[in-house]
UniProtKB/Swiss-Prot annotation:
Name of the featured protein: Replication factor C large subunit
Gene responsible for this protein: rfcL
UniProt binding sites for ATP: 50-57
An individual GO BP term: DNA replication
Listed Basic and acidic residues bias regions: 464-473, 604-635
Pfam families in UniProt: AAA, RCF1-5-like_lid
Keyword Protease: no
Biased composition (Polar residues): 476-487, 500-511, 589-603
Subunit structure of this chain's protein: Heteromultimer composed of small subunits (RfcS) and large subunits (RfcL).
The keyword ATP-binding appears for this protein: yes
Role noted for this protein: Part of the RFC clamp loader complex which loads the PCNA sliding clamp onto DNA.
Organism the protein comes from: Methanosarcina barkeri (strain Fusaro / DSM 804)
Region annotation (Disordered) ranges: 432-452, 464-518, 568-642
Molecular-function GO terms, alphabetical: ATP binding; ATP hydrolysis activity; DNA clamp loader activity
Length: 642
């Protein structure tokens, strides 16, 4: 006999054929799963609900093995907040497997997702079910522990208690595998004492057979297992019985507190004691006992004295049983408390309202509280216009349920469905072309926009006469990252340039041809004697002075201008080429040209600056300052403006 693991886990069914009991429920689950093989069914998730130990989780795992599906499971031992569920189950539900098969997502004990530890879990499950591409199985003991939204999205399959006659063959098989001789009476007693819980029956068998090779009835424990009473059976015993003791036993066997039990009795008492002749005395008497029980429940909360639960339970149970004056035959379908349903609806609407307020606040850079108190009513009024409703739905990314709530409707009308469909089309177009609806496009936060700084550009164009003219272009408008347009401040045309500046630039353009560079940046250009004519370079007032000096333009063979260095190579007769880089408006070039030419150079006003060269150097070399001077507005002369 091996005690390494529990027998209930060791002999867990591996296929659907090995499942004990609930054959119809297993068949329903198999039919639903086969629909996934040909596409996505209408109900993308299923809820297996029923008592503990009847094989719900084992059936889900057996289904995955039969269909060769991968399994991802989240149970009560895992943290199941909204973030965890979306990270684990959400990612698994939205992606296909590597080999193209299906992945079964199992959420065990889904009805126990509540409290601070599992904050937002129910809402995350509902969102995953709506968009899942993989089958999802929810397992719950109490179907009413799930929200109405999840229940409407899922296919409900109920698992009932396993009959004792179905347990006996399974228990005999376990005894044979463990080499234990167990009498039929002992097996029958274990099966009947399990209360329909096969897992508990196997655990009882393991506990009784520990250290034994044979098992008889005398070896079994005299105390039986505490069996939880079903709420519907307990309600039947309370309303049908006239014995107060039996009614109290049924109530004590429930896994319900007196605060919950009083709501069950309050909901079903008018239906159970309804009389055809219109006599309401029994109903009046029953509610009188319930009101007194409610007083004790209030004192329990106020004084924290839980001993008063005893008196409250006796009043609500025994008072209801003895309040009837005659029996009420017939079957009554007992309903869960409507108060819980209303509270669930209110909680669901409150969560829906907060989600909408969060989206509105994010779009308007406001808090959720401010949006909830001040902006939701404004947006609700804006939905009355169909075009505005479409832009709001697309801009905020509203779901159909959120659109229904914000519009104040109770159900999805054809108009709202049309608005939602057009908003989805607008979102698809926005993803392909731009950022969606222009009016409700979320602007970029302050300080994070990356503006295009190249607003102004200099356009160097070559005119017909070969001269370069610089034109400052100002765009009419530009669009920022957030989609907002910026005005051009009235600069539809380039700013006017003063005539003096134009003359200065025209004079410079004949001697210096910078290409596509800005006018204040020198580029290497070679000038030949053909480039200099008296008509273009030498003013008439300076022609006489040049003739007196005796320098002819054809004696200049070449002048080379470079950006980094300046070299002037010449003698009194200028036999060779003259290489020039920059000129100074303050100091003359010595030992390179004649004194007469040096005096003429003093009158030259050029943009770059040069430094004085030593007297003993054979050839003059000067360096250009790294930061060139700005072009002055006054008229400037070139080298040959003598």
């Amino acid at each position: 006999m091996t005690l390494a693991i529990e027998w209930a886990e060791k002999y867990r069914p591996q296929t659907l054929k090995e499942i004990v009991g609930n054959k119809k429920a297993v068949q329903y689950l198999r039919t639903w799963a086969e629909k996934w093989l040909s596409g996505i069914p209408d109900r993308r998730a299923v809820v297996l609900h029923g008592p503990a130990g009847v094989g719900k989780t084992s059936t889900a795992h057996a289904l995955a093995r039969d269909l060769d599906w991968e399994v991802i499971e989240l149970n009560a031992s895992d943290q199941r907040t909204a973030g965890v569920i979306e990270r684990v189950a959400g990612s698994a539900a939205s992606m296909n497997t590597f080999f193209g098969g299906k992945r079964l997502i199992i959420l065990d004990e889904a009805d126990n997702i509540h409290g601070t530890a599992d904050r937002g879990g129910m809402r995350a499950i509902a969102g995953i079910i709506k968009n899942t591409l993989q089958p999802i199985v929810l397992i719950a003991n109490d179907i009413y522990g799930l929200t109405p939204t999840i229940r409407n999205l899922c296919l409900e399959i109920k698992f009932g208690s396993v009959q004792s006659r179905s347990m006996v063959p399974a228990l005999k098989k376990v005894c044979e595998s463990e080499d234990i001789l167990c009498s039929p009476d002992a097996i029958q007693q274990i099966a009947e004492g399990a209360g329909g819980d096969l897992r508990s029956a196997i655990n009882d068998l393991q506990a009784a057979a520990t250290g034994r090779k044979t098992l008889e009835v005398e070896d079994l424990s005299t105390s039986g297992r505490d069996v939880k009473e079903n709420i519907f059976k307990a309600m039947q015993r309370i309303f049908k019985s006239t014995d107060c003791k039996k009614a109290l036993e049924a109530a004590r066997g429930l896994d319900e507190s007196p605060e919950d039990l009083v709501h069950w009795i309050d909901e079903n008492l008018p239906f159970q004691y309804a009389s055809k002749d219109g006599n309401l005395e029994d109903i009046k008497t029953g509610f009188g006992y319930l009101s007194k029980a409610d007083l004790y429940l209030g004192r329990v909360k106020k004084r924290q004295n839980y001993r008063m639960w005893r008196y409250a339970s006796m009043l609500m149970v025994c008072g209801t049983s003895v309040s009837k004056t005659r029996p009420y035959p017939g079957f009554i379908k007992y309903q869960p408390p409507s108060l819980w349903k209303k509270m669930g609806q209110i909680r669901s609407k409150r969560d829906l309202r907060d989600n909408i307020a969060s989206k509105v606040g994010e779009h308007n850079f406001e808090s959720m509280r401010y949006s909830r108190n001040n902006l939701l009513e404004l947006y609700s009024r804006m939905l009355k216009n169909e075009e505005s409703a479409i832009e709001i739905t697309a801009g905020l990314g509203l779901e159909l349920e959120e659109l229904i709530y914000l519009s104040g409707s109770t159900k999805a009308s054809k108009k709202l469905q049309k608005i939602y469909e057009r908003a989805q089309e607008l979102l698809l177009e926005g993803n392909e072309e731009s950022d969606g609806a222009e009016f409700f496009r979320t602007p970029a936060p302050p300080g994070n926009s990356k503006e295009d700084l190249s607003v102004f550009s200099v356009n160097n164009s070559v005119e017909k006469d070969g001269k370069h003219s610089e034109r400052l272009e100002v765009p009419n408008s530009r669009t920022s990252q957030g989609g907002q347009k910026t005005l051009n401040f009235g600069f539809d045309i380039p700013p006017e340039i003063s005539p003096e500046t134009k003359n200065s630039e025209n004079n410079t353009s004949d001697t210096i041809k910078p290409g596509n560079l800005a006018p204040d940046i020198l580029a290497p250009v070679t000038l030949t004697p053909d480039s200099f004519t008296s008509d273009t370079l030498i003013p008439e007032q300076d022609q006489a002075e040049i003739d007196d000096i005796g320098i002819k333009s054809d004696s200049l063979t070449s002048i080379s201008l470079e950006h980094d260095s300046l070299k002037v190579k010449n003698s009194s007769s200028l036999p060779g080429p003259v290489e020039k880089e920059a000129f100074s408006d303050s100091e003359p070039i010595e030992n390179s040209i004649s004194p007469e030419l040096s005096r003429s150079v003093k009158s030259v006003n050029r943009e770059p600056a040069i430094k004085k060269v030593s007297d003993n150097s054979e050839k003059s070399e000067v360096k250009v300052s790294e930061t060139p001077k700005k072009v002055e507005s006054k008229t400037q002369k070139t080298l040959f403006d003598f």
